[in-house]
Amino acid sequence: MPALGSAENPLRVAIVGSGPAGFYSAEHLMKREDLSVNVDMFDRLPTPFGLVRAGVAPDHPKIKSVIRMYEKTAARDGFQFFGNVEVGRDVHADELDARYHAVIYAYGTATDRQLGIPGEDLPGSHAATTFVNWYNAHPDFADYDFDLSHRRAVVVGNGNVAADVARMVALPRAELETTDTADHAIEALASSGVEEIVVLGRRGPAQAAFTNPEVRELGELTEADIVIDPAEMELDDASRAYLESDDCDPTSRRNVEIFTEFSSREPEGKRKRVVLRFCASPVEIKGDGKVESIVIGRNELYEDGAGAIRARDTGEREELECGLVLRSIGYKGIGLDGVPFDSGRGLIPNEAGRVTELESGEHLPGHYAVGWIKRGPSGVIGTNKKDALDTVNSIFADLEAGTMPELREPSANPETPGREAPDGADTVSVTIEELLAKRGADHITYLGWQAIDAAEVTAGEPHGRPRIKFCRIDEMVEASRAAEAV
């Protein structure tokens, strides 16, 4: 048999997930001129690009321009996209093992971390990711209903997602209507009764995880004042020492400078206001059948034995009336049947991207992880490029060492995922396309996605918008089929 990776015997790789980590992995794999690689990319949505489409704020179109790089990868010979295909529903992990030399799991962290406080499950208390998906037209969240009638909303968290949702609630209709915000969200946000958005940070200004541009934007809102009580900027000794040290992250130092400038501003009397609070943690959400208030505990900072600056409760309490609570305190992944998973950390266990058995720590040949499901929800979009290179280098090393597994015989019945094939079933000859067709999976090709894309852009043009997004899977499938029929 010709060498694996030759033109006669290309390396076959499946990538589960089509966000930045998945596309960077595909690009690193396919750009090697001395290696022949075929990549099949799977996503449970009909649309690719993951959080670039469904997570980046609609008023940040420049960030979304990275999609042009992914489009070049998708245009490479040997690349195929299988949208609207869910691993575990339409195809089992074992069936991917049978058809690919390597499977890269790049499906991100889909669930949010809980606050773990009383009242967290009251109507009106939501994960910030749910809110983000809702205004970004994610089809799973199109029918969500957010109560925006109360004058105050509270956002829990001090990272960029918290800044995004606070800013989106503060934007006026005229600005929303120049973006690709979902139509249903534009109407709800533009007509909301929210006048004040309070953003709570567990630790102090020096520990806030915002990037500098996100912080600056909060001070540039056309119809919302930015408010920080000067008392919030009274730093503890440990934070001052950190800011003055050579170890200080320049982002943290600049954030504190921006916060200090905000705290000196006099409110201009704009229609709304965004209030940043530090050393404040929610301890209870109250209400009779819905969110009516939130109890906030005051924290103090201390330096632990390892030199880390941590927060502890002082026992001081404050109650704020509100009608909406959005928590943005981190994310975790969910497991796939047949793939090792560390439920405590919410990650696929791995070493340098090689998936490992949870108990023994042994490498699982042919299985790899990349992105947030590999390392946790950290970094920006570009962080995934280096992360993907590390994982792909592990694949190359395994290929050169001869430890890449051969293609295995499929073990599942084409009619039903996860069931043993009947005796004598000729499942070896069933390609992934045939398998999906037998299951009735209505998969979307990259050509189909391009038709969806074109339809959205065309719909937005008369309104001066970059696109009007479909928010229903059946609408996406219909748009894709119109092109594939030509």
Predicted segments with their positions:
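N-terminal Rossmann-like FAD-binding beta1-loop-alpha1 element of flavoenzymes
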Residues: 13-35, 163-169
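Dinucleotide-binding/catalytic capping subdomain of oxidoreductase cores
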Residues: 37-38, 163, 167-316, 393-403, ...
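N-terminal Rossmann-like dinucleotide/flavin-binding domain of flavoprotein oxidoreductases
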Residues: 38, 46-102, 251, 256-270, ...
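Feature captures the FAD/FMN-dependent oxidoreductase FAD-binding
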Residues: 69-124, 283-295
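Glycine-/small-residue-rich beta->alpha transition segments that form the dinucleotide
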Residues: 102, 106-113, 159-160, 322-335
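Glycine-rich dinucleotide-binding loop and its adjacent helix/turn
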Residues: 112-191, 348-357
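FAD-site-proximal beta/loop scaffold in flavoenzymes
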Residues: 124-142, 285, 290, 302-375
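C-terminal, flexible cofactor-proximal segment of oxidoreductases
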Residues: 354-486
